[in-house]
Amino acid sequence: MLVHVEDGKATRVEGDPDHPVTRGFLCGKVAQYLEREYHPERLLHPMRRIGAKGEGRFEKISWDTALDTIAARLKSTAEQHGAESILPYSYGGNMGFLNGSSMDRRFFHRLGASRLDRTICATAGATALMEALGTKTGTEPEQFVDAKLILVWGANVHGTSVHLWPFIVEARRRGAKLITIDPVLTKTAALADQHLFINPGTDLALALGLMHVIIGEGLHDADYVARHTAGFDELAELVRGYPPERVSALTGIAAEDIVNLAREYATTRPAVIRANYGLQRSERGGRAMQAIACLPALTGSWKDVGGGFCLSTSGAFAVDRAALERIDLEPHPTRLVNMSLLGEALTELDIQALVVYNSNPAAVAPNANRVRQGLLREDLFTVALEQFATDTTDYADIVLPVTTFLENTDLYLAYGHYHIQMARPALEAPGECKSNVEIFRLLAARMGFDEACFRDTEDEMIRQALASGHAYLDGISLERLDQEGSVRLNVSPTGEPFQPFAQGGFQVTHRQPAHNGKRVQVGRVHRVGDGRGIAEHVADRCGGPGQRISDGLWHCRTLPVAVGVADVGRPAGLDMPEG
């Protein structure tokens, strides 16, 4: 992104026309970013709560007062309840690597605080990729133009992967066919050559059904499977139980369409699959993603330029996280708290202090009522680092104003392409805003942490991150990033097939989890007890199969009764804190 600045003020932003993936285009959110940057409600000074929790009433205080208050409270909390009673809570924020995964992690590790298991977005999918491919990487967007069949599975690329969409458009101009699989008729689905409505939560069944046809008709690449995969015989035995008729009953897709899709996918070269995170946020969603990711290994489509699979490219950014986060600073191993279970943690565990940054848990964490119940505790000391007042800051005892990405030096990784980027501040921070890095650096000094790493500058930490020794980062330095801004990782050379398994082989068979089948909750997951699919549970509660409506979602006339709404067909009230 390019920022035009006159007399110290940004006048407009635009996409970088020289970037090989974004090619000068900004999404609607970022294109309007200056409205956020200069919004009159931006937080500019540290504040202390003066009203009841949840009221959002504060008074302005100095940075010295704010930092001294926080340090004193964290020290006393650690002394009285143990440092594990202190919990950090953060996630993506403005996506800056330093401002989300460096000085903050060092601070909490040195403190001995509880660690946060950041599960809210993509844990199931990421785990699935590691089990299926051995790495969290995939076909790069530039190669989609070479595909002859593009299968978009559970993704609205037109609206949520706007920089990939032009490559798909170009591929179709060259003759590629676009097929979408989604419970919803998205804009992408409406533009596709073929759309298959699938019952929610049945993606695993469809993937196994496709494998049934591919293997049963001998359409798999036997040589590729023999040389590059493990567990084929077990997989072949497993998918025998998923003939098209059974899969059709589960998924709602006609058996004929399942057979035709399997044949077309297996025989069209190159063929590429683009999936997204929505389908892994369901019962057995991780297993569904694992199965889908195995399809290119069956057909050998990884051999082709423009073939393969992509959920995320994030695993290729092999920066030295250990050097940035410094878990070795922990005085002893500490407990891990699942961020998706924050409500339970605040109401059941001995959490006495909560430090929130790069996130708004009162609005985004599952079980919102339980989260708010915890945030209302008078004995809970809450600190929030924010750019604006949010649902979470309303409950905070201390609020600290932070910078935007236009005001930071930071390193930016990606999950949709293979270009690493560094940015310098385009603007000076307004008011008294400070970066996350600077805030935790100052807090470390207040806490008496005298390790040299707490005095590292942003440039020093970027150098540490790039010094992982991984081949993907060979030749990529701070100086080069400073000069070029964006640099492509040393993944497969341009024009050659992308190979995701250089660091590990394909694993295509199901392995029983070592943790006794305990589920990992990711995002807003509806948990059910017996492990069956969502579709079957909806059917059970309705007393029969769900009724399809035009956009491919489920409609159940009797479900309101099951969830406590007595009069079906009459308006029902939905209470929200805002009224």
Regions found by a protein language model. Give the residues of each.
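Hydrophobic, low-acid, alpha-helix-prone terminal segments
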Residues: 525-528, 532, 538, 542-553, ...
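Flexible, glycine/charged-enriched surface loops at secondary-structure junctions
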Residues: 81-85, 220-225, 272, 303-310, ...
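N-terminal export/assembly segments and adjacent metallocofactor-ligating motifs
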Residues: 1-219, 241, 246, 254, ...
